[in-house]
Amino acid sequence: MAKQTNYAQPWSQFYGPNLGYVIEMYEQYLDDPNSIDPELKQLFEQWGAPVLEEPVSPADDETAKTHQTFRLPETPTIFSKLVAAVKLADSIRHYGHLVADTNPLVKKEKKLRRLELDEYDLTEEDLKRIPVAFLCPHAPAHVKNGWDAILHLRKIYTDKIAFEFSQVHNLEERNWLIQQIESGAYYPSLANKERVALLRRLTEVEGFEKFIHRTYVGQKRFSIEGLDSMVPLLDELVRQAIEHEIDAVNIGMAHRGRLNVLAHVLGKPYEMIFAEFQHAESKNFIPSEGSVAITYGWTGDVKYHLGAARRLRNQSAHTMRITLANNPSHLEVVNPVVLGYTRAAQEDRTKPGVPVQNTDASFAILIHGDAAFPGQGIVAETLNLSQLRGYTTGGTIHIIANNMIGFTTESYDSRSTTYASDMAKGFEVPIVHVNADDPEACLAAACLAFAYRQRFKKDFVIDLIGYRRFGHNEMDEPMATNPTMYAIINQHPTVRKLYAQKLMEKGIITEREVDEMEQEVAERLKIAYERVPKNEDELDFIMDPPKPVVDRLPEVKTSVAKDVLHRVNEELLQFPDGFNVFNKLERILKRRSGVFAQNGKVDWAHAEILAFATILQDGVPIRLTGQDSQRGTFAQRHLVLHDVKTGEEYVPLHHISGAKASFVVYNSPLTEAAVLGYEYGYNVYAPETLVLWEAQFGDFANMAQVMFDQFISSGRAKWGQKSGLVMLLPHGYEGQGPEHSSGRVERFLQLAAENNWTVANLSTAAQYFHILRRQAALLTREEVRPLIIMTPKSLLRHPLAASDAEVFVDGAFSPVLEQPGLGADAGKVERIVFGTGKLMIDLAEQIGKMESLDWLHIVRIEELYPFPEEAVKDIIARYPNVKELVWVQEEPKNMGAWLYMEPRLRALAPEGVDVSYIGRRRRASPAEGDPVVHRKEQERIIRCALTKHE
């Protein structure tokens, strides 16, 4: 075949590492044409040696470029040099970070065998004969030949900023990164006035820390010193965001440097921070311009946990909100919470169907610790959310605040990887390592990260490598445990001093101007300090919850008109023409038809979908997530139907007439902590939305215990942070063993105080319907609180747990239910049995098989917390001859609700009336592993509860 000539195609599409591959294949082709891929062989036969167009600048104009065409030589010796040069260039790209100058304390050894010329049998003269474009097609104009290209690549990849992107598999992304990095397009060209402004910012950062260090001796502040450049880095990300008219930036970070970020990025007034150090009243200070939502709960939190929000406006009057999330000391657990904020800020929930997401509306910045990033499992859980349809936020910018130590633990004891950031490689996240002593390089890293996030909607990691000037906190003496590192740190100049020296050497600023800048900052801090009252001993802090929290929940209408329920019910059973529902499932669903016309029975899942449909008609958006939640763990829900022939999905709740808000249900990844934290964050940011998280079994909720403890139960008391999150925890003893029986209700009751949440264990479908509708009605009210429901498993289809249709039309949620048919003759009742949840249905089932039980009454406590004291008191008062109040439960005595209920029942028991317990004895494990043993225990408990003592 005759070779085509005079045209660079198809080779013009190859450059950089891709061109290197083509060159290597061509070398192999010259040795043995049959040793390569047939398609590539055909290209070489048709087009000959690869041809390349290299941009060439005329001698008199460095910016104007023409193109010169080169064809690969067919001489094996010259060709091998070209292949070697391409390999060298690729090695610099891939391994330059290993010798880069990113450690501010210790200079790395610059020599690495795989980056040296002799490793590839190359000389400077060899490289000078090679065109630039073979090695660095995006090089600036001053790079004239292959030798210049190698020097350029070494400078780019081994300086104060280093790059890792070989883990990025997407070719478009990798090529874009190469183009940005090697052309220098991402690196900002700062004017002198911008450099002076940067120095001023560093002076503010350092001055703030030094002032606190001198003024509040020995108080914890978790100084930013050594990572001062983090503040201008954040400034740059905020600047980029508002320039691109993003609506919201949400930040999550731990305690290190938090006060500085609050002051300088969030605009929290110095006076407020100083007042917190002095335990003085701080709420009277007017926030600085734009600073809003600095909130407190009634018990409060330490100053370096508090969040804040700020509004900024750009020149075109676009307003952007910056939020720093409230955070406990538990490292990294705020990460999914912030992503929940971000997703909520991105979605329009005002129309029926799936919420419309705009990832340009908001983005998240997560600031990690170098020990915590590889050490805390929730980091990996959160990274895994990044590309999932139910959780993606269009890319998070991660900043590792890397001070090369964790408390007293050196990096060699805290991770098994080269870098703190290495775990992110498993998620194909590009990584930049940057020396925190070079603030301009830090700005460049921010620019690259933001541009990548905006273009590809994916995560990006900035490994900001600095140090910690003092100990873990300001009372620690690090020389005792880390003497080598701190001997260097104690002699190391600050970032501000280094940058000031650099600007003075360039003639951009004078020493006098630097001194004046320091004095101005010090004076501002002094004035702020003097405004803070010093009368801390006279303060009378009130630590009582506000009245809406203390008060009982208001009465809200949860019943729905019969005609509305009938119409909604029938709409839920209509499918598009040609949509093929699985036959067995369709038969089950069709049984629901006509239930309101015939006053039939409604089971649990049916009640749930009716509640959801009517809530949507009330204009309340709904978001439900959990493992297998679309179908339901127990195949009960089926909110998403699948065409058995095409796999197409159909969601009946998207097609309800009169719906005014969005509905979505997502199957979550096999993760509890990150997903629950995400849903909590979503609900906090979008309080008008009914957000539900469902555990696959309640037993697995303790994988997210930190979220219950640090956020959901206590967030309002600590931070004033309201939530109406609903948690569905399948619970009940059915012989499935110790890991599929108990949602550990005792833990939620132990945490219950100050009306911080509602804990319910329901026994009927109508109760579930009404409590969901009540929660939806309270979402935007001050009385809102999280709702924990111990949901059933065996009751999902149990006829005694199903409810008459009329209860949905005329009923309401009742915290207490009484067993029908018992207690009619008040004078004969001697025992009142109290219990909750699924066991109440077991008792009801057994009662149906028994003779007269006029000596017995049974009361179901449907809402355990807040305890329905008045309702229980009224029931007890109806029975003048009662001798015994009994609490019955399936759980062991040291678990379940007994320890919570015992003192309450004793307080309500009339004089001379015993309070006793029936249930499993104290156990280390929640349940038996053998179903036969389980059945015998259940039978014993039921028998004891229903047997009269003679």
From Swiss-Prot:
Oxidoreductase among the record's keywords?
yes
Q: Which SMART domains match?
A: Transket_pyr
Catalytic activity, EC? 1.2.4.2
The record lists the catalysed reaction(s) as: N(6)-[(R)-lipoyl]-L-lysyl-[protein] + 2-oxoglutarate + H(+) = N(6)-[(R)-S(8)-succinyldihydrolipoyl]-L-lysyl-[protein] + CO2
Query: Which keywords belong to this entry?
Result: Glycolysis, Oxidoreductase, Thiamine pyrophosphate
Gene Ontology terms: biological process: glycolytic process; tricarboxylic acid cycle
Q: What class of enzyme is it?
A: oxidoreductase
Task: Kindly name one Pfam family recorded for this protein.
Answer: OxoGdeHyase_C
Which cofactors, by name? thiamine diphosphate
Organism domain of life: Bacteria
Which Gene Ontology terms of cellular component type are present? cytosol; oxoglutarate dehydrogenase complex
InterPro entries associated with the record: 2-oxogl_dehyd_N, 2oxoglutarate_DH_E1, 2oxoglutarate_DH_E1_bac, DH_E1, KGD_C_sf, ODO-1/KGD_C, THDP-binding, Transketolase-like_Pyr-bd
One term of GO molecular function = oxoglutarate dehydrogenase (succinyl-transferring) activity
Instruction: Please verify whether the record's keywords include Oxidoreductase.
Output: yes
Q: What does this protein do?
A: E1 component of the 2-oxoglutarate dehydrogenase (OGDH) complex which catalyzes the decarboxylation of 2-oxoglutarate, the first step in the conversion of 2-oxoglutarate to succinyl-CoA and CO(2).
Family note? Belongs to the alpha-ketoglutarate dehydrogenase family.
Please give the subunit comment from the record: Homodimer. Part of the 2-oxoglutarate dehydrogenase (OGDH) complex composed of E1 (2-oxoglutarate dehydrogenase), E2 (dihydrolipoamide succinyltransferase) and E3 (dihydrolipoamide dehydrogenase); the complex contains multiple copies of the three enzymatic components (E1, E2 and E3).
Q: What is this protein called?
A: 2-oxoglutarate dehydrogenase E1 component
